[in-house]
Amino acid sequence: MARRGSCSTICLNEKLQRFRIVRISDKADNFNSRSGSFFERSISLVLLLWCFLFLVYSKLGQSHDDYGNADRIGNYTDGSVSKTLNSTSSVFPQATEKENNFCLLRKGQLQDVYEHVLVNNALLICKVVLPERRISKKTLEARDPRYVNLEDKSLKVNGSSQLVNNGTRYRLEPDGNGYNYASAMKGAKVVDHNKEAKGASNVLGKDHDKYLRNPCSVSDKYVVIELAEETLVDTVRIANFEHYSSNPKEFSLSGSLSFPSDMWTPAGSFAAANVKQIQSFRLPEPKWLRYLKLNLVSHYGSEFYCTLSVVEVFGIDALEQMLEDLFVPSETPPSKPAMVELKTADEKQDGEIKSNRTDQIGKETEAQKKKDDVVKTINIIGDKKYEVKEKHNVLKVMMQKVKLIEMNLSLLEDSVKKMNDKQPEVSLEMKKTLVLVEKSKADIREITEWKGKMEKELRDLELWKTLVASRVESLARGNSALRLDVEKIVKEQANLESKELGVLLISLFFVVLATIRLVSTRLWAFLGMSITDKARSLWPDSGWVMILLSSSIMIFIHLLS
């Protein structure tokens, strides 16, 4: 973009210079036709004015850039034009360094005018020659999708597969991302790892918070990944996003078509950078692999744990490559770049200015064509060799798959025969099963009806339960009231009993007293002792008898109650 901007700026300056020259020539012709005699009579005055204007414009030109000077085109003279050319060559040194002889002494249309003024002084007219346009590798990569870098964004293009410089096609997802054959979602899995490793299957997932963890002190750290399919592996990407751990430094890759395997085919040794981001590593030569073994040789830093978050494998499987060869054949080798010709309208208008360099450019073009033909021949030969080898590998893999399919087909036929032999028994079993199913359906219907009845009875029971509960609550309230009445009666009964006991004691006392009196009277009478009349009048016997009788009756009533 910078070179294109410089070329456009040089073309603009060249246009401005030609416009100034033409305008100055027109003014000079008109001025010469109308006032030629005036110049002849006052050459000294014109020379002084010319020197003064040259000094003034030279001072002004140092304080303004090309765009500021372009606003005053009508006020420029030939000295300012040469000054502008000098400033242009200082701003664009690449154009002046490559073309050292682009300034020519040429007599133009202004020669006649200046001969009248400066006495046959030749005009130094500078021609700005556009630099040769060289197409860089980045430009070709931007214009031709076959040139793709193996960085993180190298696998994001449109289409089902993508060509790279060595002719390998990458299988892509529908969204344009690379098809990861080491993804757990595609069917890949970890089949083996060292015994100290923890979370080995985490490298196949998308959760960066989970990772493979190994103590850094372990010497043999490895993990064996079974890819989703037998793949022509071309690129492997790894990453470690765990901050408090050591990053992998040197690691090696090896592969095999079967597992377990005693012979692992080396795929390459690589050195990773000490960064917390995904890094891409391209195999020196793509290899057909089903099992990929990753050996972690060394690490950065001195942390206790060495972790690994992501392992991704990109390439193309045999079926995908065959489909690409059948339906999307490449017309040109992927390593042969297309030569881009850059032609603009300004170059067509400047054909007369470049006429002096036509022969030289033609010679360089012929030499470049010869060189390109040699490179093209070498690339075509290399691509044909690689294509033949690649097709041989694809054919080998397809033959292995065909043999495997034949073996599976024979096993399938045996299993079908066994199933046909067992079909009558299976039919009987199916009939029995159908009978049992019908019986079960009838039982289920009966159970459903019984369930409905039970639910109805349960509802009735719930109603009865609520009724009984209300009655029990009323009985409980009556019982509490009755208990209070009983307590009152018990208290009254205790009072009555205490009173009865007092009456009984008093009655017993009087009974004893009356008995003693009557007995003593009879003893005195028996012993002949006389009782005076006065004493009998004071204590008559009939009174004591009444006291004894009443007290006895009270005691008898109390005992009966």
Swiss-Prot record:
One of its GO terms (biological process) is nucleus organization. Gene3D superfamilies: Galactose-binding domain-like (2.60.120.260). Its main location: membrane. The chain crosses the membrane at residues 36-56, 501-521, 540-560. Keywords: Coiled coil, Membrane, Transmembrane, Transmembrane helix. Disruption phenotype: No visible phenotype. Embryo lethal when associated with disruption mutants SUN3 and SUN4. InterPro entries: Galactose-bd-like_sf, Suco/Slp1-like, SUN_dom. Residues 454-499 form a coiled coil. Forms homomers. Interacts with SUN3 and TIK. PANTHER family: MEMBRANE PROTEIN CH1 RELATED, SUN DOMAIN-CONTAINING PROTEIN 5. This is SUN domain-containing protein 5. It comes from Arabidopsis thaliana (Mouse-ear cress). The lineage of its organism: Eukaryota, Viridiplantae, Streptophyta, Embryophyta, Tracheophyta.
